[in-house]
Amino acid sequence: MESRIASAAFILVVATYIFLGGMGVTDRDNPAPRDAAYNLLARGLLSGHLYLDKAAPAALTGLKDPLDPEANRIAREDPRYRLHDLSYRKGRLYLYFGAAPAVLVFIPWHLLTGGWLPHWGAVVLLCAAGLAANVVLVRSVRSRIFPKSPGWVLGALVLLLGLGSYAPLLAARADMWEVPVAFNYFAVSMALWFFWKAVTQPEKAVRYIAFASCAFGAAFLSRPTVLVNAAILLLLLAPRGVRGRPSAWAAAVFPLAFCGAAAGLYNVLRFGGPFDFGESSQLAGVYVAHLHMFDGSYVWTNLRLYLVQGVDWSWVFPFAHEPAFWRLEGSLPVNHGGIEHVAGALVSAPILWAALAVPFFIRLRRPDRSFLLLSVAAGWVALSSLLLFAFFFGTSSRYQFEFVPGLALLASFGVLA
């Protein structure tokens, strides 16, 4: 019965992802998945080059400064070209995101099926895979730490992890920006599973440390913001039986370092420098190279927006709506880039407050060390991502998906506690 309830909940959540993804905003003005941004990158890679398999239009290449947002506005906003937020350098178009989703998702899909995976399909697939990893993790934690919890609770936790993680919001707007975020969700979920295996099976710790490092490395090749999360690898090296083993340190460092070097080489070949991910070459509505991308003056505003910003209630379905942000724009810090579809996570998903039960459970019941380490790891993943994006110049619901899944995982532990 327990497995049936959990399976039904999982199917319900994935069906929700599919419905929202298929009905949502994706690949605007682009009816053909073959021409979606990540498939353009996949086609380019299959052709032996790093730029998109798409020619830059003469309306762009003929400009004195193609990156000038006023000069490129006509070409950038022309629906025939779909240039917005692509990167441009030396007559070629690039994605400023990493190549991992193209290499590990879009190209294999094409080789196996002969078709081209739409962006929304990739986001749904990755969110479903990430959810599956988290469900397996929570089920293992439950059997080890909370064996007397009722059977139905796993089904409830599937709903918490699947709907309270903000994945539905990502699926509803599954375009090229959401693909690397969904990829990182899956990769970090796998890293946390390998983390748990490493702390519960110390005789196989080196193997699982290497797997966790590989997962973080793959995520870095998709979206470098994940690097702050990878600090949890240090927790795996802390136990006395592990920290003195050179093989454990090598397992933690080498896969991630190799992926970091690969990302640096990828950037050199595209933009001329290992740390240039292409943002300064973006075709955006602003001159991205001139922005104050990270600043301490944004922190408190962004934390308020991400965590406790209220919603507007109405009698119109779905009854809760994002606030009219024109009312808030006057209070934004200088150089702040604006607000995009944000409602406070702790307000819109109040079940996340259950995460507060975890430290009390640890203090009162003193479970084994593995649960303590996993809770710290999940907390660090959530906190480090939240703080990183608190310093960023703009707020967006897709950035919330960088830290809310970690809170949802902790909340599931809190419900069990």
Predicted features, each with a name:
Residues M1-A417:
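Membrane-proximal envelope and lipid/glycan-remodeling enzymes
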